[in-house]
Amino acid sequence: MKLDVIGVYDWPIWSKEVSRFPWKYDQKETCYILEGEVIVTPDGGEPVKIVENDLVSFPAGLSCTWEILSPVRKHYNFG
């Protein structure tokens, strides 16, 4: 799927430095990673590495831990 077709480049941008924090998704989020490297570990699940140019979706209700290995910038969209 082409990124411009789903409007990725019109989505807001979020940035975060190297860090580790818990997160819970109250609603579905789709994001496109512009820069950085992240390991997202769902509570009770296996870690998933997310890197530059990955398009990922997180379901509503997901509880996880974000471990940002290198500063991240991403486009994101809720719903």
Q: Where are the predicted features?
A:
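Double-stranded beta-helix
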Residues: V5, D10-I13, R73-G79
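Short hydrophobic/aromatic-rich beta-strand segments that constitute the beta-sheet cores
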Residues: W23, V40, K74-N77
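Ligand-binding loop in jelly-roll beta-barrel domains
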Residues: A60-G79
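Short acidic-glycine-tyrosine-enriched beta hairpin
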Residues: G44-G61
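Short histidine-centered beta-strand/loop micro-motifs
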Residues: F21-Y25, P42, V48-K49, E67
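Short, conserved beta-strand element in jelly-roll/cupin
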Residues: Y25-V40
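Conserved short histidine dyad/triad with adjacent acidic residue
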Residues: G7-D26, P59-G61
